[in-house]
């Protein structure tokens, strides 16, 4: 795959997995993502968003670090956790990155103990990650990348406040949102979480505009925040 200044070990793994040519989305986003800027990337299902996530994490982290995670990836469900782990296994073949996934059906104590031994990339579902970050107090000072994949279905399940709770515990890091559509909920979350993001829209369908008045999505967000504060 021909991308500017791509890691040689990553390049080799991409070629071995048949990824010899970068598609439009990979070409147009690679340099911006590599720069560390916040981004919103909109693209349809099957366009290679998961591959972009993995190759950019590998590109930035390069190899094994210290004990604390340096990339945090939020995905929709257990199936997505396993899928992302599999892509890391393939494309990270020539790196020593330590990747670990958590989901709602996993054992909390086992997950906490495993993470405490040292990992580089943590993948998980919103509920599980929120619960873990609330109770375990992980060191997030070395976190370089905070990535939200599957943003549209995740926000439809009203996980905004859990995501913000995790994001607010992190000081300076690159924040990236991936989704199939740029919905109102995503725009509201991005306004709260991202700093002057670059927006890449590869969705063929044109998005409708949003009203300036407070929307139903905003009201839902505020209600969710109030509910979680009472927990």
Task: Indicate residue ranges for each PLM-predicted region.
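Post-DEXD/H (motif II) to motif III coupling segment of the RecA-like Helicase ATP-binding lobe
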Residues: 140-228
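Helical mechanochemical/support elements of P-loop NTPase systems and associated helical scaffolds
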Residues: 2, 6, 10, 21, ...
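Walker A/P-loop NTP-binding motif
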Residues: 27-39, 49-65, 89
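Conserved catalytic network of the ASCE P-loop NTPase/AAA+ motor domain
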Residues: 32-33, 63-67, 92-94, 113-117, ...
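Conserved pre-motif I regulatory segment
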Residues: 1-42
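Pre-Walker A (Motif I) flank of P-loop NTPase domains
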Residues: 35-41, 67-71, 173-174
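The conserved Walker
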Residues: 43-47
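Conserved nucleic-acid-binding Ia/Ib motif block in the N-terminal RecA-like helicase ATPase lobe
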Residues: 3, 66-124, 128, 143
């Amino acid at each position: 795959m021909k991308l500017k200044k791509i890691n040689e070990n990553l390049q080799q793994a991409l070629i071995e997995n048949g990824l010899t040519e970068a598609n439009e989305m990979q070409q147009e986003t690679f340099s911006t993502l590599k720069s560390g800027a916040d981004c919103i990337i909109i693209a349809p299902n099957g366009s290679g968003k998961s591959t972009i996530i993995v190759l950019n994490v590998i590109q930035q982290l390069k190899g094994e670090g210290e004990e604390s995670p340096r990339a945090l990836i939020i995905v929709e469900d257990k199936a997505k956790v396993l899928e992302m782990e599999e892509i890391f296994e393939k494309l990270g073949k020539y790196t020593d990155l330590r990747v670990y996934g958590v989901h709602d059906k996993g054992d909390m104590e086992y997950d906490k103990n495993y993470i405490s031994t040292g990992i580089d990339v943590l993948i998980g579902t919103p509920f599980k990650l929120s619960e873990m970050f609330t109770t375990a107090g992980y060191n997030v000072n070395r976190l370089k990348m905070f990535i939200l994949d599957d943003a549209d279905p995740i926000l439809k399940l009203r996980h905004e406040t859990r995501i913000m709770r995790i994001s607010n515990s992190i000081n300076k890091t690159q924040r990236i949102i991936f989704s199939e559509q740029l919905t109102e909920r995503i725009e509201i979350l991005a306004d709260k979480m991202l700093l002057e993001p670059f927006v890449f829209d590869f969705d063929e369908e044109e998005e409708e505009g949003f009203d300036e008045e407070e929307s139903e999505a905003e009201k839902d967000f505020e209600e969710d925040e109030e509910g979680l504060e009472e927990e």
